[in-house]
């Protein structure tokens, strides 16, 4: 498994190019310490202090435990490095202004549960954690508003495929 990136994610905002997140210290994230990795995962902040675009699903990862983030960091450090340098994102104006992501975060970034479940036992709570956090299921299976925020009142109810081909299915218990 080499996490060299390069995949292009088409959206209404333009095209995001998946970065190299291999252990290469120059082209990848190999020079990041655990604090930098955690800050990216949980707050969407790069080591240089700039906002990461929410095409990286930190809006879900913010729900991950510190231990799970540390374990993921340790695992990724064991994977092969790649010196592949990827193209920059190709975003439409004004989405190309990275500073505006701070406003998006103000509106949409929080670690509240997406669904309130009364009297959930440990198994249900763990499943909710996996779906809402590391699994980041809602990032594709939930429709978005005009600013790219998740329509949480339609949580996991299916969404248009951002690449324009078909739909991402409804995965709610009452779905088709």
Predicted regions span which residues?
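Electrostatic cytochrome c docking/interface patches
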Residues: 103-132
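Small/polar (Gly/Ser/Thr/Ala-rich) solvent-exposed segments
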Residues: 145-157
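Extended, well-folded interaction surfaces typified by the phenylalanyl-tRNA synthetase beta subunit core
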Residues: 84-99
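Ligand-binding pocket scaffold of soluble enzyme catalytic domains
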Residues: 51, 76-79, 83-84
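Electron-transfer interface patches adjacent to heme c in soluble/periplasmic c-type cytochromes
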Residues: 8-39, 59-69, 154-176
């Amino acid at each position: 498994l080499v996490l060299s990136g390069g995949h292009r994610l088409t959206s209404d905002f333009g095209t995001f190019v998946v970065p190299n997140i291999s252990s290469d210290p120059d082209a990848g994230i190999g020079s990041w310490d655990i604090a930098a990795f955690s800050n990216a995962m949980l707050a969407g902040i790069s080591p240089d202090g700039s906002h990461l675009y929410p095409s990286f699903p930190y809006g879900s990862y913010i729900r991950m435990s510190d231990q799970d983030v540390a374990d993921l960091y340790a695992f990724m450090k064991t994977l092969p490095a790649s010196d592949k340098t990827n193209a920059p994102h190709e975003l439409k104006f004004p989405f190309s202004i990275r500073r505006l992501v701070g406003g998006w975060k103000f509106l949409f970034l929080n670690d509240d549960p997406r669904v309130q479940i009364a009297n959930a036992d440990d198994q249900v709570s763990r499943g909710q954690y996996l779906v809402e956090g590391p699994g980041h299921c809602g990032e594709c299976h939930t429709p978005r508003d005009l600013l790219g925020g998740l329509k949480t009142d339609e949580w996991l109810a299916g969404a248009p495929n951002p690449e324009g081909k078909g739909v991402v299915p409804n995965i709610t218990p009452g779905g088709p």
